[in-house]
Amino acid sequence: MISINNLQKKFGEKLAVNIDHYEINQGDMLGLVGNNGAGKTTLFRLMLDLLKADNGNVVINDIDVSQSEDWKNFTGAFIDDGFLIDYLTPEEYFYFIGKMYGLKKEEVDERLLPFERLMSGEVIGQKKLIRNYSAGNKQKIGIISAMLHYPQLLILDEPFNFLDPS
């Protein structure tokens, strides 16, 4: 599913990512652990073609992410609240994301049902813009939107950072 080949990214003199070769197979679940500044987020941004690699490439389902956008159809991601359109309500944002994947409003509503417990009555129906939500609720909105279209590949960066233990 994912092949990382000779991937390098430097910021000035600091080598942030240096991966000779790594394969992630369909169905694998992988967690990256490392110190702050170790390159985890940089790797995710390279995988999502949000950063240009200095060398190498990332291939998802035989698609080089830097050469085509077809991989986006089966990939969901949430890196940080910069992914959110914070002048929308959560409902508007979910419908916007759904529309990008060809989902009707009714389908989006149906796909939100399994997330009701996660939202804890604090996200939907609040008549607030995303910018006015807590960091934890923004995190929930981002995670849910990344999963809305049932992606084959889900990339989440520090997904539990701002979430309550409950």
What are these model-derived regions, one by one?
Residues I2, V17-I19, K72:
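Conserved structural motif at the start of ABC-family nucleotide-binding domains
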Residues L48:
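Helix-to-loop junction immediately C-terminal to a conserved catalytic motif
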Residues G56-W71:
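Conserved ABC transporter NBD signature motif
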Residues V33-N35:
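The feature captures the beta-strand-to-loop junction immediately N-terminal to the Walker
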Residues L154-E158:
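Catalytic Walker B motif of ABC-type/P-loop ATPase nucleotide-binding domains
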Residues L129-S134:
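Conserved ABC ATPase signature
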Residues L148-Q152:
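A short, proline-enriched helix->beta-strand linker immediately N-terminal to the Walker B motif
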